[in-house]
Curated annotation (Swiss-Prot):
Signal peptide: none
Top-level taxon of the source organism: Eukaryota
Compartment(s): Mitochondrion
Further facts: Present with 1360 molecules/cell in log phase SD medium.
An annotated Gene Ontology molecular function: RNA binding
Protein name: Cytochrome B pre-mRNA-processing protein 2
Species in which this protein is naturally found: Saccharomyces cerevisiae (strain ATCC 204508 / S288c) (Baker's yeast)
Entry GO CC: mitochondrion
Role played: Appears to be specifically required for the splicing of the terminal intron (bI5) of the cytochrome b pre-mRNA. Can also stimulates the splicing of the omega intron of the precursor of large ribosomal RNA.
Record bears the keyword Mitochondrion: yes
Keywords: Mitochondrion, mRNA processing, mRNA splicing
Chief location category: mitochondrion
A biological-process GO annotation: mitochondrial mRNA processing
Length: 630
């Protein structure tokens, strides 16, 4: 499992020295770019809208419902804008502003209208979305029989109910209590009779007492109606509820419930629901925004006028399906890491030649390293994935994005290492030759300005990167074909990619050892202070390569990756040359590669024995590293 706080520290140590490139100095501006974009969009006379019905204030929306809205945002046509339709309001009034719009709009990729629309103002073609949303109490006309928890949709659809479905055990009990006659219940909204039906699929009711039968919306509910007349009635629409009818349903309300992506009831006490609100009962947008205030030091300076959690972080948290503050911290780390990757290009704009598609750009020969090919292969795989349309595909898509971002962060660390190693030659170019940095630029600018995944999870940062990099955008004929050729099937390419995967493992473990040495604490209540780099003087990293399989270029690259002195040896006896230092951690990377972290300690410090479990692990790694391969 990725430790995003460790990767955040790795990124923080490699950020630009100038404040103009620092995360906190730019995040408020990046988020606020939403406002002029919205203003510009709503000036259009022929703007198309995505109308989203909502029963209540957007600021108080449940995070599950907001996730559904964001899924619509992901899949809506690019030129559309979003407008909220309030189904709980009927009185006509002047334009009603969305409460805390300036904190909510940055969570959307599409422009979000500042003003809500009343349901009564919509034309007849508009139909609110049908979802199971609550539990209500229903009773017989004489009040003798009651069902305390019946699954029910949005209140506005109550007039469409044609009966109550119950399990066999409940049906038999009610029959017995009513002297053998099938009881008739009453719709709380309009007092119309609701016949009782026995449901064969008891899973749709779960632990509750029953479910409203709505054949107009749920095809499966039509099987309860057998005569031709009754079948015909199921296809006839009923009027949507008036305000008074909805108030009656509100009085009968017995709790909240949700609908899953298949439209089936989703229970709040189910295990999968519990994990989504782990780490605190964060179930509404209001609660998430309020809880995020305690973390404002992470993304803002004291001088910032707006210290609200950036919309990209809130959006990614909700789309992660883990509605916790712990997850919000992780999404902050990812946002920070992506921004710092972007600054590699931003800080070196003067070294990038601009070749637009209209220029007569020369035909360059491209030269790619295996770490270039590896990250490009990961990028191509992410681009080939389908855009998520439901919760299940969203979870899988988000997992892939996180994995790709981890790889991209490793690639950026390798790039920075390469820039330190070849600090002069990396920028050298001429009329027929691309510099090494221009090769890197072609990859990074493509990923940062064209990635579907980055746009989905970090839309504000994505648009900012596009705008900022546009003046120096390199568009070279043959670039894509050239880099694609390095990842095509074939033994040589496959071998290169395996080699790159090995480099990734080495680099990641090196970075984790680096964090173990510096050990800065991830704080949310005050600015994070980095420890001095001179601390690394007391440490050494030894990489045991028994087969001598790590290429020399990899060794040099890894040595420049960190301030910690790093050695490569092919025999364990060579490690003993550093016997004046004491091993404090070790990691087995594969059967022939091991990494050791040494610290210079006095004899008194070493006397404390290691915990028994750590000794066992150390012994296993020791045996494996000493094992002779035949």
């Amino acid at each position: 499992m990725v430790n995003w706080q460790t990767l955040f520290m790795v990124s923080l140590r490699r950020q630009g020295s100038s404040s103009r490139y620092r995360y906190k100095f730019n995040m408020e501006n990046i988020t606020h770019q939403v406002f002029p974009r919205c203003k510009q969009a709503f000036k259009k006379t022929n703007l198309s809208y995505e109308y989203c019905d909502l029963e209540g204030v957007l600021y108080n929306i449940s995070l599950t419902d907001l996730q559904k809205l964001l899924l619509r945002d992901i899949n809506a046509p690019r030129e559309h804008a979003f407008k909220i339709v309030r189904t709980d309001l009927t009185q006509k009034s002047s334009k009603k502003r969305i409460q805390h719009w300036e904190r909510i709009a940055p969570m959307f990729d599409h422009p979000l209208s500042l003003y809500e629309k009343l349901f009564s103002e919509m034309d007849e073609d508009f139909k609110p979305s049908f979802e199971w949303q609550q539990l209500i109490r229903v009773r017989c006309k004489d009040d003798k029989l009651k069902l305390q928890r019946v699954i029910w949709p949005k209140s506005i659809f109550s007039n469409f109910c044609r009966g109550i479905g119950v399990k066999k055990s409940t049906y038999d009990r009610l029959l017995e209590q009513n002297n053998g006659e099938v009881p008739m219940f009453v719709n709380p909204a309009n007092a119309k009779p609701l016949p009782l039906f026995q449901v064969s699929d008891e899973a749709m009711i779960g632990e509750f007492d029953g479910i409203g039968i709505f054949p107009y919306f749920v095809d499966k509910h039509r099987e309860f109606f057998v005569t031709e007349v009754d079948k015909l009635k199921t296809k006839i629409a009923s009027p949507l509820c008036t305000l008074n009818e909805r108030k009656r349903i509100e009085k009968a309300n017995a709790g909240r419930i949700l609908a899953n992506e298949e439209g089936k009831p989703f229970y709040l006490d189910a295990n999968s629901a519990t994990t989504r609100i782990a780490g605190g009962n964060v179930v509404t947008l209001k609660q998430l925004l309020e809880r995020s205030v305690s973390h404002k030091t992470l993304w803002s300076k004291q001088s910032n006028k707006d210290r609200t959690c950036p919309g990209d972080i809130l959006r990614a948290t909700i789309l992660s399906n883990d509605f916790s503050i712990r997850q919000l911290r992780a999404e902050f780390c990812k946002n920070f890491i992506l921004y710092n990757i972007f600054t590699i290009l931003q800080r070196n704009k003067k070294s990038i030649r601009s070749f637009s598609g209209n220029d007569n750009a020369p035909s360059f020969q491209f030269s790619w390293n295996v770490w270039d090919s590896y990250i490009w292969k990961q990028y191509q795989e992410t681009e080939s994935m389908k855009i998520p349309t439901d919760q299940a595909s969203l979870i899988n898509y988000k997992t892939k994005y996180d994995s790709f971002l981890h790889d991209l962060q490793t690639y950026s660390a390798l790039v920075i290492s390469e820039m330190k190693w070849n600090q002069f030659s990396i920028f050298q170019n001429d009329e027929t030759t691309l510099s090494r940095f221009e090769h890197i630029t072609l990859i990074l600018q493509t990923v940062l300005t064209k990635s579907k995944m980055i746009r989905i999870f970090q839309p504000n940062l994505y648009k900012f990167m596009q705008d900022d990099l546009r003046p120096t955008l390199m568009e070279l004929v043959g670039f894509t074909e050239s880099i694609n050729a390095t990842i095509e099937p074939g033994f040589a390419n496959e071998q290169s990619l395996q080699s790159a995967n090995g480099l990734k493992k080495l680099a990641n473990q090196l970075l984790y050892f680096e964090q173990e040495i510096y050990g800065e604490k991830f704080r949310v209540n005050r600015p994070i202070q980095l420890r001095p780099i001179t601390l690394s003087a007391n440490y050494k990293i030894v990489i045991l390569d028994k087969k001598n399989a790590i290429p020399e270029i990899f060794q040099t690259l890894l040595k420049f990756m960190t301030q910690i002195t790093t050695y490569f040896v092919k025999d364990l006896s060579e490690v003993e040359l550093h016997g004046h230092m004491h091993c404090i951690d070790k990691k087995m990377l594969d059967k022939s590669k091991f990494m050791y972290l040494y610290e210079e300690k006095s004899n008194e410090e070493v006397k404390a024995a290691s915990p028994q479990k750590e000794k066992i692990v150390d012994n296993i790694i020791g045996l494996l590293s000493n094992d002779e391969e035949h």
